[in-house]
Amino acid sequence: MEEELKCHNVDDFYLKELSNIYSVIYDENCIFNAIKMSESNYLCFMDDDDSWAPEYVSRLLSVLANIQSTYSSVNAIACHTNKVAEIAENNRIIINSTQPWNHYLNAGPVSFDVIYYRNSIPLSSCLFDKNSVIDVIESHKLSSPAFFWPFFIHYLAENDVWILPEALAFYHFRENDDFEFGNYTVINNELFDIECKIAENKMMRSIDDSSLLNVLLSNIANNSLFHKISYIENKIK
């Protein structure tokens, strides 16, 4: 299969090496088409800041296949994640600490209350049955830093997600506050929050979305309002 590579301000040497193994696609519509045309039965995402244990893919694949043989509504799996605090210095990464991120999530299907804690299940800890993703993913903006959580809420309204209580994914947090080495969503937290809200509002306005999805989104809005009112009341006292 002929590999197609489009270069956009990325190191030429890196791209040359990468092109021998993978296709790099930047256009969003091309990504959607590539997902549809792929012969793979599964789909996963890797944030460029994060990392996996060597057995991540094989372990999640085997557990998901086993679970699906019993529970047909389970079309995705997420493992426990460790938070890695680190500093980037030139070409070196210095790890300061590693600690549990979401180890409170029990084995089994995810409860709906997980949606109240944004990124409690990180993008890089999930593996999906590809066919279950196709109809959902096209409603979301892949190029947005806030892509995953609105997509995950939408996905959870239509599918069950199984939790594997094994820490096989690593959620990296750069302590640098500069744009070269820091985490985009941390440095641009306000923009990230705005894009999440816009995506959630768009889903709430869509007449095509399920009633369950609208209930989930309404609960998020009500929960946010409750915390804001409580904060104001505490300030008044």
PLM regions: where:
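General helical secondary-structure elements
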Residues: E55, A88, I198-N201, S224, ...
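Catalytic core of nucleotide-sugar-dependent glycosyltransferases
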Residues: Y171-R174, F181-L212
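N-terminal cationic leader/targeting segments used for protein routing and processing
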Residues: C7, R92, N131, M203, ...
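Nucleotide-sugar donor-binding/catalytic module of glycosyltransferases
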Residues: M1-N189
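Heptad-repeat coiled-coil amphipathic alpha-helices that mediate oligomerization/assembly
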Residues: S210, N214-K237
